[in-house]
Amino acid sequence: MTLFGATLALLDRESIPCALIGAGALAVHGIPRSTYDIDLLATSARVLDDTLWASMVEQGVDVDVRRGDRSDPLRGVVRLKQGTDRDVDIVVGRHHWQGDVIARARRARIQGEEVPVALKNDLILLKLFAGGHQDMWDIEQLLVDGDADVHAAVDAAISELPDDCQARWAALSRRG
């Protein structure tokens, strides 16, 4: 079993919902972008508990748990590494809207595993929240087909995000 598969199995066994985000999710939506790691989103604080990963550590997985403080926009990040397998990063969100992203995700087969994948509009919300240059490029690629339903879904949810995210969305929307 791959590191990705083992991670999904553990999260499933522990009833911790997650969704594929990042370049893997972009690829599902037809936007190829090269990356070595696989990114998952979760919101359960249990993901940051070292004891959750004990069985994987026993199997030789390197687990790096980084907890955010109260001022951090994320609860934290967990990076899993094992040999030459693709790294798995679990971004642990702290906001209700991030849980909604996971709840709306649709299942797809990725690297032989069934995994919930964030919808296009939800990837846009996550990218607006991250706010980097690559994130803005990714948003432009997600919008290239001009899907009015995607725009409408982002418009409907954007008020849940911080003001700077709303401003970025307004600027992107004006550009067309």
How does the language model describe each region?
Residues 1-176:
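Compositionally biased terminal segments of proteins
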